[in-house]
């Protein structure tokens, strides 16, 4: 990446963190350039989230030094990090769903007027101006519960920007988004990058990493094993860095032969919201059955209905070709569901 020390906005030196005898981070050195997107990759358990939580003050590092804009910093907690220019948008959004957009934006830092009362007019004005600059049209009075995951995520990013953040960490932000929503998110990220804000983008999705990132770093077993410009690396090199070996066959042939149907779901519908409608599928013995969908699609509700937690409105569940009757929760467990 050359000599770019004058462009470094965030520098981590020798960061280590252990939980008991488990060494999660081992003397990590990482630089993030101003006005760039740094992709952070690694297998599950590599240390990505722990590293960012140490940066954000959620965890306290055991060793190491953090420099922000050339100055050494050590945050006592997330509030301290936010007030000093580092924000983090978690994969699981931390929002009060029953409150509106404005309340969530100013939660914990409500402005007050000369009488010591919450200045709601100022809050709305500042929120409107913030979303205008971001090119977003948002109903400020709308409860967060009524917004899509994508809209809620954009609001969380707007909140991070409202702290005048220099660095924003995005922890797998596209895991619950559609292709169109990902495009909107990337447009916003490019706009922030052009404004000089640096972003750390955690993801497992290679195509997205190469589309949006300027630099890419890889963690493996708590060690930083690679940092390169996105233009100077490729997918195979990233995979090798992540797993620690060359994968000769990324998609080996499957020779497993599933046997007879062991679980059959027929025309399953639920009685209460969120509704399931006419769900039918079979699971065979010795088969790994994948269940895919975005947040809110009904995956959890489906499994809870099969297990007997939710009430069925229609449909049947068959185990070993015999209908299952749910009278209480102990029955499914006795039937090995």
Regions found by a protein language model. Name each.
Residues 2-329:
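Glycine-rich phosphate-binding loops of nucleotide-dependent enzymes
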Residues 328-337:
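Single conserved hydrophobic/aromatic residue that forms the stacking wall/gate
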């Amino acid at each position: 990446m050359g000599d770019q020390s004058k462009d470094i906005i965030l520098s981590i030196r020798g960061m280590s963190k252990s939980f008991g005898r488990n060494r999660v981070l081992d003397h990590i050195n990482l630089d993030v350039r101003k006005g760039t997107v740094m992709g952070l990759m690694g297998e599950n358990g590599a240390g990505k989230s722990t590293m960012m939580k140490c940066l954000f003050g959620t965890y306290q590092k055991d060793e190491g030094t953090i420099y922000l804009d050339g100055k050494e910093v050590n945050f006592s907690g997330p509030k301290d990090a936010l007030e000093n220019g580092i924000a983090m948008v978690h994969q699981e959004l931390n929002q009060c769903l029953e409150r509106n957009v404005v309340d969530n934006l100013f939660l914990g830092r409500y402005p007050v007027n000369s009488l010591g009362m919450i200045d709601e007019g100022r809050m709305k004005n500042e929120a409107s101006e913030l979303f205008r600059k971001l090119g977003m049209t948002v109903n400020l009075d709308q409860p967060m519960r009524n917004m899509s995951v994508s809209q809620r995520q954009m609001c969380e990013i707007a909140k991070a920007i409202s702290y005048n953040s220099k660095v924003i960490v995005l922890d797998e932000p596209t895991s619950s988004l559609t292709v169109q929503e990902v495009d909107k998110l990337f447009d916003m990220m490019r706009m922030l990058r052009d404004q000089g804000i640096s972003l750390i983008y955690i993801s497992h999705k290679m195509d997205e990493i190469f589309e949006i990132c300027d630099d890419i770093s890889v963690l493996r077993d708590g060690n930083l094993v690679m940092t390169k410009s996105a233009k100077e690396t490729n997918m195979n090199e990233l995979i090798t860095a992540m797993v620690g070996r060359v994968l000769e066959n990324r998609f080996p042939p499957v020779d497993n032969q599933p046997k007879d149907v062991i679980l059959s779901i027929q025309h399953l519908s639920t009685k209460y919201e969120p509704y399931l409608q006419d769900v039918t599928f079979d699971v065979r013995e010795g088969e790994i059955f994948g269940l895919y969908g975005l947040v809110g699609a009904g995956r959890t509700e489906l499994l809870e209905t099969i297990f007997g937690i939710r009430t069925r409105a229609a449909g049947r569940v068959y185990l070993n070709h015999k209908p299952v009757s749910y009278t209480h929760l102990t029955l499914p467990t006795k039937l090995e569901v």
